[in-house]
């Protein structure tokens, strides 16, 4: 009889209805969360006060395309990133992690490394693999030794609390794990592999001027990565899922997250409560 495999993430976390799943993003000074129809963010400003704002999401209406494999992932990613301008307008105190000077330095370094790889390495796939890994530099430099790692832990702890016990459980986010199976860290491996393969195919089959075709291949690569990410969340016991979550968990526990204080969790709680109030008004979250 095979021993039951120990779960990597919070054991008490039940699978929530899909419409109840919340997304989030660590800010440099707080937390952004979003649900089916709204976003909310809470930050601690320079005076130490918690400032909160919320608003409606811009939903992409693409008809049947919204539910097609590959395309649906791009739509969801687009919706998540589309809230950023709204957050900037609604909460001027918010600071995005990518604004960190280390992220800018990392982006420059990644560009240089990718350029060197294209000149020095013979195989296209090797060039693209090095470029893809180097592309992680901005995120790694932002998280390493910065407050962003704390906020990157507040988001999964708050989400796991809500998914396991509803709105009342958000106050107990401190007892939940800072690693989450739907954290963006679990998208890293699929994204590296899919974009490396996609860019290799694109450079091999299409001319440099075939911008349209190469753009389509790049979009499909990202869509494929999101499909792998979603599959892994649905079937965590599958060998592929274990590999994806193993890499993601190692990143989350190793350097991408750092245990937050109670003061930090209060900011996350403020963001979650603002989001839940907004969604409750529209009835977009089910019991």
Model-predicted segments: where are they?
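Short amphipathic, positively biased membrane-proximal segments
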Residues: 1-287
């Amino acid at each position: 009889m095979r021993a039951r495999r120990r779960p990597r993430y919070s054991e008490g976390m039940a699978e929530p209805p899909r419409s109840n799943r919340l997304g989030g993003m660590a800010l440099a000074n707080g937390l952004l969360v979003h649900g089916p129809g709204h976003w909310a963010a809470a930050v601690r400003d320079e005076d130490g006060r918690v400032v909160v704002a919320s608003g409606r999401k811009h939903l992409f209406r693409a008809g049947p395309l919204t539910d097609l494999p590959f395309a649906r992932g791009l739509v969801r990613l687009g919706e998540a990133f589309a809230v950023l301008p709204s957050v900037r307008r609604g909460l001027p105190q918010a600071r995005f992690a990518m604004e960190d000077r280390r992220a800018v330095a990392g982006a420059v370094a990644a560009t240089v490394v990718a350029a060197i790889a294209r000149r020095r390495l013979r195989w296209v796939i090797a060039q693209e693999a090095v470029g893809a890994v180097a592309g992680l530099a901005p995120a790694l430099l932002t998280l390493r030794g910065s407050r962003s790692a704390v906020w990157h832990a507040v988001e999964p702890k708050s989400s796991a609390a809500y998914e396991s016990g509803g709105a009342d459980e958000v106050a107990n986010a401190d007892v939940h794990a800072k690693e989450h199976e739907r954290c963006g860290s679990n998208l890293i491996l699929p994204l590296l592999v899919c974009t490396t393969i996609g860019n290799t195919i694109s450079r091999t089959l299409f001319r440099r001027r075939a911008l349209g075709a190469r753009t389509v291949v790049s979009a499909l690569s990202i869509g494929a990565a999101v499909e792998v990410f979603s599959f892994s969340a649905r079937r965590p016991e599958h060998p592929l899922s274990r590999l994806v979550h193993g890499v993601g968990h190692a990143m989350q526990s190793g350097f991408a997250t750092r245990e937050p204080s109670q003061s930090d969790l209060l900011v996350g709680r403020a963001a979650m409560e603002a989001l839940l109030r907004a969604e409750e008004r529209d009835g977009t979250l089910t019991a």
